[in-house]
Amino acid sequence: MIQVLLVTICLAVFPYQGSSIILGSGNVNDYEVVYPRKVTALPKGAAQPKYEDTMQYEFKVNGEPVVLHLEKNKGLFSEDYSETHYSPDGREITTYPPVEDHCYYHGRIQNDADSTASISACNGLKGHFKLQGEMYLIEPLELSDSEAHAVFKYENVEKEDEAPKMCGVTQNWESYEPIKKASQLNLTPEQQRYLNTKKYIELVIVADNVMVKKYTSNSTAIRTRIYACVNTLNLIYRAFNIHIALVGIEIWSNKDLINVISASNVTLDLFGNWRRRVLLRRKRHDNAQLLTAIDLDGPTIGLARVGSMCDPKCSTGIVQDHSKLDVMVAVTMAHELAHNLGINHDGNQCNCGGNPCIMSATLNFEPAYRFSDCSRDEHWRYLIDNRPPCILNKPLITDIVSPPVCGNYFVEVGEECDCGLPAHCQNPCCNAATCKLRPGTQCEDGECCEQCQFTSAGTECRAAKSECDIAESCTGQSADCPTDNFQRNGRPCLNNNGYCYNGKCPTLDHQCISFFGSSATVAPDVCFNLNLKGEGNFYCRRENTRIFPCAPQDKKCGRLFCVLGPTGNTISCQATSSQSNVDIGMVDLGTKCGDGRVCNSNRQCVDVNTAY
């Protein structure tokens, strides 16, 4: 039998009311000094880790005792988490720091069912918690007594800037058809299973060089800022059954790798190009957010492409580091990430139960922690219509050496499910007290799990997206849909106008339409002769600054040329290029370049039977 030893640290609690103080969070007009009392339950003789899996702190707020329960956010980092920075001479330096014993926690206030908390315990307690419907912040005081903390309401923090702050996404609500509520959607069983399946977003955050200067080249401060934001991001997205794992951060310590300017739409486009061309080749991830300290144009503090999750270029966002408060920047990042997940701004008809809404176009002065009914319905509709594939891939989870914690919403070693604490669990398949499946059940989540049982073999769980894709069906032996496969590369498609390549049917005409609109078509051969010169933007291959002209047989694998509508007696060769991304405007790999021939990775037009 395990004996439990209660260890109490810092027994005294001396509340003190202050009128005004300058803290890391800003100027605070009214605050309370508290000395949190930490109570830890440890097995007798057990070695105490640096940061325990669960902790409790007792202190007083407004003279009333509260108990803050904390549980380590074990899924904060992926197993292959990495950090990249650059030496003064521009060399890329990537490290894989140990992150198992980190100090970031989620939590709740005892006897307050609606409470939440996002706390860093790295050097004292720093973060925020919700108590009786109000947002409080806590942070250590820099006093000789290191246990002293300030607790204060968010409303008592002096606003840094009274000017309105807004998201850069623009839309005209009146132009949209009314959104069907989730209850009105006529879902098939397969669609309902997909919605119920837990989703995962593998996130990379890039800090630009202005961030480096703002934090005086203190990479620890930048990392701490990012970790705190993602910890809060995770808490917010529980509402959508989405787990966010930080797989990497990149700090542009030497110089910006793109031209970061105040025009947010331009910067976002450049960042997306860089992500597709550079970052994705180096680091597997689903979404990347650029955290910048530049002052974006006008009231804009963030921008993202709506409905772009998993897209190589557009699954990105830009977030301005606009506040001293971690929570305000985290809420902005949650807002932009929601755009990637197909969610637009809330209209007047949207409801958050009397609380500020995350998807308000204008930033609320009080941190918004809730998605509206409109946001939920739009997100569900986006998932059903688009099925972004990357968010079903479970990230590699850091191998935790400490025991699993039942009730932290994260399935760890030895657990079969984890639906939170018994008071919050709404999963009929899972025993919240043991984190084991209930007797007679086979599963609790997955595209091939229905009413706690494996779906029958042969039931379609992923429809084919095109004639080059393959529909997948449940095996009857697993809750997971089989790996997404597609037709063999080189199979004819679109009435022999193209050949399948990685599940798609790339053609020159379709690429012209994507660049120039529905009236665009591929240009005559005479335009492609420009690729034979190997000058300027017209070539087949590029190695650093050296360009190589196309051989005559390869000219339709270099720069793409299009025409817009009827040409008459004059041919106007249209092409596009980008200084920041040399691949923009080039013919896609796998595109048909002649009968029985396709463009390979060396931009050569080769026999389709030997290309793959």
Curated annotation (Swiss-Prot):
It is found in: Secreted. CDD domains: ZnMc_adamalysin_II_like. Its EC number is 3.4.24.-. Binds 1 zinc ion per subunit. Coiled coil: none annotated. GO terms for biological process: proteolysis. InterPro entries: ADAM_Cys-rich (IPR006586), Disintegrin_CS (IPR018358), Disintegrin_dom (IPR001762), Disintegrin_dom_sf (IPR036436), MetalloPept_cat_dom_sf (IPR024079), Peptidase_M12B (IPR001590), Peptidase_M12B_N (IPR002870), Reprolysin_adamalysin (IPR034027). Residues 1-20 form the signal peptide. Residues 199-395 form the Peptidase M12B domain. The keyword Disulfide bond applies. Its cofactor is Zn(2+). The disintegrin domain belongs to the long disintegrin subfamily. It comes from Crotalus adamanteus. Ca(2+) 2 binds at residues 405, 408, 410, 412, 415, 418. GO terms for cellular component: extracellular region; plasma membrane. This is Zinc metalloproteinase-disintegrin-like 2d. Expressed by the venom gland. Glycans are attached at residue 218. It comes from the Eukaryota.
